[in-house]
Structure formats: structure tokens, C-alpha cells
């Protein structure tokens, strides 16, 4: 993302980011800025050919993926894998671990590079390899100062949201560090047009490998912890809708409607 944008472009980016993993209020604030965000694509099996992965899969050859564009018609066409849409088995099956000795290989490094580009182009704050049709345990995430600057201060405080640099994790293993939880609305690049409230742990620790193959450990809290849980869920074949609070699922257009009677309130639980 460029550092210099006119107001319309900045508002568009805010609208898209807010609908990925931000609470309702930010999404409602920017609803008036609308741009097309999807167009038909091809099967995730085409993505797998980019990385010399086996194309035999339980996925239907007719399964279509959704390609999310970050800036509408202003985006130039680039040669990147498509984001796979919900319903494709690659999103609902457990991903395979990467051999640590292969992390530095050209194939794995290309997968990581493409994941970063796709995440930023969307734009989103996280992406898992299965979302580009690659059934491997790799995630990428980042939350920039620019993204956070668009959110209201009270929202940032409620989320315990702090910026962090690009993070790449291979074979991540996540564990909660406390029983404290919070409830906020989530979205997903693979489930376009819908949102639901999901309860997540506020503090987690994640171990794994970085893109150089070195062992790393990340202690995360607040919004970063939520993003990590969301992306690690993808590696086990789970989407946020598999963990959503019942009766909170809704379209983006209905984000401003009140929660159904009996639903828990948003925020720390």
C-alpha cells in the first residue's frame, strides 16, 4: 500500500479492512464508500500447479475461488494465486506440516511471498496457505499503523490493538495463556460478504518456524492474538463460521442491526 492516497482511496481501504476483523462500529462508519470487491476465478487446483503441488484432491474441479480486489478498477492485473472461497475442501481439511528442512526451498519461499502479496492486495491483516489453495501449515499476518489509524480511539482500546510488523509462521502451534476472552465480529477473505461474532482468547502463545527455518515463539494479546487464532484455525480446516456465536451471522449490509435478544454483548467476556 502506498503512503500517499487521496481521501477516497483511504476511505475505501478503511472500509475493506474494517470488514475483515474490526468490530461493527468501524464498518458502519465507512459503509457509504462502496466498490466491487470480487469477481469469478478458477479452481484452487490451478493455484497448486504454481507451486508444483500434487493436483489430486477431493476438491471438485468445478469449485470456483473468489478473487478479492483491494482497490477496485485501479488495481493492475498481477500473476498471483486466487483466494479460495468457502466450500472448497482445501478450507475444511487439516493442512500438512512443512518439512523444516524444506522451509528455505524456492517452492516454499514462493508460497510465502505470494501469500504476503495476496494479503496486502486484498487488503487483509492475515492469510493462511489453504486460502490460496495450498494445504500447508503456513500463515502470514501484519497490522500496520496505517490500518489502526483509521479506527476510533475507543475501538482501539477495546480491542487492545497495537501495530506489529509482518510475521511469517510455518507449522505454528497455538496455546492460550489465560482464560480471558473477548467477543467481536470477524470476517474472512474466503467468506466474502458475511460477518459473525466470535469469542477468542485474549492471550496466546504461538511457537513455530520463521521463513528462515529458525524456531520462534510469539506471545500475543488483544487483537494480534485474535488474528493468530483466526489464521491457525484455517490450518485445522476451521472457518470463523464454525466457531461463531449462534444467531450473530449476518450480511455486511446488516452489520449495524442489533444483536438478537439473548446474545452476549461485544467486548471482553
Swiss-Prot record:
Disruption phenotype: No visible phenotype. Binds 1 Zn(2+) ion per subunit. The active site is at residue 231. Keywords: Chloroplast, Hydrolase, Metal-binding, Mitochondrion, Plastid, Protein biosynthesis, Transit peptide, Zinc. Zn(2+) binds at residues 188, 230, 234. InterPro entries: Peptide_deformylase, Peptide_deformylase_sf. Residues 1-60 form a transit peptide. Its EC number is 3.5.1.88. One of its GO terms (biological process) is co-translational protein modification. This is Peptide deformylase 1A, chloroplastic/mitochondrial.
